[in-house]
């Protein structure tokens, strides 16, 4: 009798987890789209937008897919970081609170703002400054080997993909100085990967703690 009563409990425990995973992915997607739009507005000051400004007023813009791609990438990164932590057996415990995550987002936006607002002597100085700021963001809010490795991998992959799109005429920047864009793009991708990874980790931890609390109540 006891075994019959306990048998059906497997699927219900799986379904909430799957639903929570989908909700977490959706939230990360929306955050990614929002940050893409905000960061684009910052770059408008230099006329170096990641997609034409009219995307804000029309879904039929020639680059309407760019913020959607950013949202999809943000969801994938945010879900991947906790999975890698579990796979490596290295749960991330450094500064695991929402206030730290919000500061990380603020620093990420600040790095983007610096690339748009501050005038550097040359592109090399811009690259070195943003690289130092991005590594500083990782050291301040992450400090994990998995975070550093994924950040570098994301930066390399995203930069290569963006350049291939430009070279093949699928996409183009609005700036005449293409070298300027390439100077800050890898650093922005790296910092963005670290930021979305921290958000994903925090959401996963919040979900895990909620499930543990619920199991204790039951």
Curated annotation (Swiss-Prot):
Residues 1-21, 82-96, 142-146, 201-218 are cytoplasmic. One of its GO terms (biological process) is cholesterol biosynthetic process. Interacts with scap; interaction is direct and only takes place in the presence of sterols; it prevents interaction between scap and the coat protein complex II (COPII). Associates with the SCAP-SREBP complex; association is mediated via its interaction with scap and only takes place in the presence of sterols. It is found in: Endoplasmic reticulum membrane. Keywords: Cholesterol metabolism, Endoplasmic reticulum, Lipid metabolism, Lipid-binding, Membrane, Steroid metabolism, Sterol metabolism, Transmembrane, Transmembrane helix. The chain crosses the membrane at residues 22-44, 64-81, 97-119, 123-141, 147-168, 183-200. Residues 45-63, 120-122, 169-182 are lumenal. Belongs to the INSIG family. InterPro entries: INSIG_fam (IPR025929). It is a multi-pass membrane protein. Oxysterol-binding protein that mediates feedback control of cholesterol synthesis by controlling both endoplasmic reticulum to Golgi transport of scap and degradation of hmgcr. Acts as a negative regulator of cholesterol biosynthesis by mediating the retention of the SCAP-SREBP complex in the endoplasmic reticulum, thereby blocking the processing of sterol regulatory element-binding proteins (SREBPs). Binds oxysterols in a pocket within their transmembrane domains and interacts with scap via transmembrane domains 3 and 4. GO terms for cellular component: endoplasmic reticulum membrane. This is Insulin-induced gene 2 protein.
């Amino acid at each position: 009798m006891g075994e019959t009563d306990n048998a059906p409990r497997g699927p219900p425990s799986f379904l909430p987890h799957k639903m929570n995973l989908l909700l977490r992915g959706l939230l990360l997607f929306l955050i990614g789209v929002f940050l893409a739009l905000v960061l684009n507005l910052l770059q408008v000051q230099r006329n170096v937008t990641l997609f034409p400004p009219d995307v804000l007023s029309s879904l039929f813009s020639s680059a309407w897919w760019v913020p959607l791609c950013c949202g999809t990438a943000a969801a994938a990164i945010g879900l991947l970081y906790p999975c890698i932590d579990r796979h490596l057996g290295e749960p991330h415990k450094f500064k695991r609170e929402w206030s730290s995550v919000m500061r990380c987002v603020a620093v990420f936006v600040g790095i983007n703002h610096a690339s748009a607002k501050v005038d550097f002597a040359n592109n090399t100085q811009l690259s070195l400054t943003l690289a130092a700021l991005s590594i500083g963001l990782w050291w301040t809010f992450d400090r994990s080997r998995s975070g550093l490795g994924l950040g570098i991998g994301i930066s390399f992959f995203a930069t290569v993909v963006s350049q291939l799109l430009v070279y093949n005429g699928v996409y183009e920047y609005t700036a005449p100085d293409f070298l300027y864009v390439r100077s800050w793009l890898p650093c922005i991708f790296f910092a963005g990967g670290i930021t979305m990874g921290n958000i994903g980790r925090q959401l996963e931890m919040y979900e895990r703690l909620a499930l543990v609390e619920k199991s204790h109540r039951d």
